[in-house]
Structure formats: structure tokens, C-alpha cells
A protein has these predicted regions:
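Phosphopantetheine-attachment site and its flanking helix in carrier
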Residues: 49-59
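STAS-like cytosolic regulatory interaction modules
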Residues: 1-50, 63-97
Length: 97
């Protein structure tokens, strides 16, 4: 689930393959309505569990943000996501805040 807070979009719950399509679509919706000047921060501090699909969702959001000319950052990624990114060799591509 994604909720808008004062300074970020707060992602909560699991980021697993079962919900990946919905999370991708929800995030894209927020990105499409975002201000180019302000950009978007996805706060992952409330994410409970991840699998490799979480990285796919993040990179999908990033492609959408780039296409729209909106800046995007990821804050507070869970350790499991950082480990998966390192395993797949994509750590440097994560837009960490």
C-alpha cells in the first residue's frame, strides 16, 4: 500500500510478487501527478518483507519518473532489498535518498 505523507510516499506492508502489479500501478499514479520541481520520495521504512520483484517495482517507478521528468528517490530501504540489489549487481542503480 502507498500513502501520501507530508514529505514522501509511504510504502507499507510486503513488497512481494503477489502485489507487485498493484504497487507498480499505484506508484505510477502518484508519479504522474507529482510536481517536476518537487520530485517524489518513496519511504520504504514500513515495508515488512521483500523479494526480487520489489526491485522490479522500484526500477519500473524509476523508468516512469524519468519519462515524466520527475525526480525520484528511495528512502529507508529494508536491508533485504539492499542485499538483493547487491546480489544482482544493481546497487548503484538504486536512487537512494
Amino acid at each position: 500500500m502507498i500513502e501520501k505523507s507530508d514529505s514522501a510516499l509511504r510504502v507499507s506492508g510486503p513488497m512481494l510478487i503477489a502485489g507487485a502489479t498493484g504497487l507498480l500501478a499505484s506508484g505510477r499514479g502518484f508519479l504522474s501527478s507529482a510536481s517536476r520541481a518537487d520530485g517524489v520520495v518513496f519511504d520504504l521504512s514500513a515495508v515488512e518483507e521483500t523479494d526480487s520483484s520489489a526491485l522490479s517495482v522500484i526500477f519500473g517507478w524509476l523508468r516512469t519518473a524519468q519519462a515524466l521528468g520527475v525526480g525520484m528517490r528511495i528512502a529507508n530501504p529494508p536491508a533485504s532489498m539492499i542485499s538483493q540489489a547487491a546480489l544482482y549487481g544493481v546497487s548503484d542503480s538504486l536512487p537512494l535518498a
